């Protein structure tokens, strides 16, 4: 029987959310990692949040009215990047469902004129790595999700460099210029959202920004001119947003510093890209998106 692919609608939210939760639970239990979606309620809430986001677009695949999987694609204007995820397929789904969803998402990304497409892959799920590789994605950066408590409270070894909130258009402009030097483009929308949420902060020395964070957490990103600046951003965050934050596994200095300050590695992940990619030459923290 043929598969149907169509946009996700509001009355699909609960079924898609439950499938996402079941899929993550099956993979995590098979490999001994904590589940990235701790409950069905979390999975349903995630789908509802993404469906309500005007910068996200979701599709599902079904057979005779039974939903088998879903996928989302996101844009972050003015960034040229489109992001894919989460891709979830029901554990009982047959082979080829994920490929159909990926193909449909990539077609949509190209229709929106995105030539840079990115995702964060869970390496515990080898099948997804194979799928993304066959779709043309390249592994760019192995990541660790670091979990722990804010270093701003209690006895710790946080950096003594000071930070202050990102406040005005001049601050935003300087942060965007630093971001461009790292990524090749700004992440202006995400930075402004973090400002609205009161979690964006920066380091400024001699009139120049040497680092900023759009929050410290799994949905946040940060860039810095040095590891000492990055330590200051992490160390001065009043809270860790979500289950933790991603750190490039190749940044031994930051990983070792975090471990020495009581953090633990939650699970590994991989940043993968399709299309043009500028490798960051300065320290950075990616988000769950990229």
Predicted features along the sequence, with ranges:
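Glycine-rich phosphate-binding loop
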Residues: 96, 100
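Intrinsically disordered, low-complexity, positively biased terminal segments
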Residues: 9-10, 52, 56-58, 62-63, ...
């Amino acid at each position: 029987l043929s598969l149907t692919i169509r946009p996700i609608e509001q009355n699909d939210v609960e079924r898609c959310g439950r499938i996402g939760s079941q899929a993550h639970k099956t993979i995590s239990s098979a490999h001994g990692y904590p589940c990235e979606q701790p409950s069905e309620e979390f999975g349903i809430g995630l789908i509802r949040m993404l469906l309500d986001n005007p910068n996200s677009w979701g599709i599902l695949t079904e057979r005779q009215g039974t939903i088998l999987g879903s996928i989302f694609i996101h844009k972050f204007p003015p960034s040229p990047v489109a992001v894919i995820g989460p891709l979830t397929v029901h554990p009982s789904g047959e082979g080829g469902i994920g490929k159909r969803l990926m193909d449909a998402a990539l077609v949509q990304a190209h229709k929106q004129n995105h030539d840079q497409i990115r995702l964060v892959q869970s390496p515990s799920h080898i099948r997804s790595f194979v799928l993304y590789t066959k779709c043309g994605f390249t592994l760019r950066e192995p990541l660790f999700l670091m979990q722990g408590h804010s270093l701003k409270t209690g006895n710790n070894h946080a950096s003594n460099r000071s930070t202050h909130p990102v406040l005005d258009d001049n601050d935003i402009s300087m942060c965007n210029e630093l971001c461009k030097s790292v990524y090749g483009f700004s992440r202006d929308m995400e930075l402004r959202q973090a400002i609205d949420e009161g979690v964006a902060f920066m380091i400024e020395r001699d009139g120049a920004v040497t680092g900023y964070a759009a929050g410290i957490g799994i949905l946040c990103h940060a860039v810095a001119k040095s590891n000492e600046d990055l330590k200051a951003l992490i160390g001065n965050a009043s809270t860790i947003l979500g289950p933790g934050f991603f750190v490039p596994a190749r940044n031994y200095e930051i990983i070792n510093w975090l471990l020495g300050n009581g953090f633990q590695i939650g699970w590994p992940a991989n940043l993968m890209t399709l299309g043009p990619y500028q490798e960051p030459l300065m320290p950075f923290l990616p988000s769950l998106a990229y």
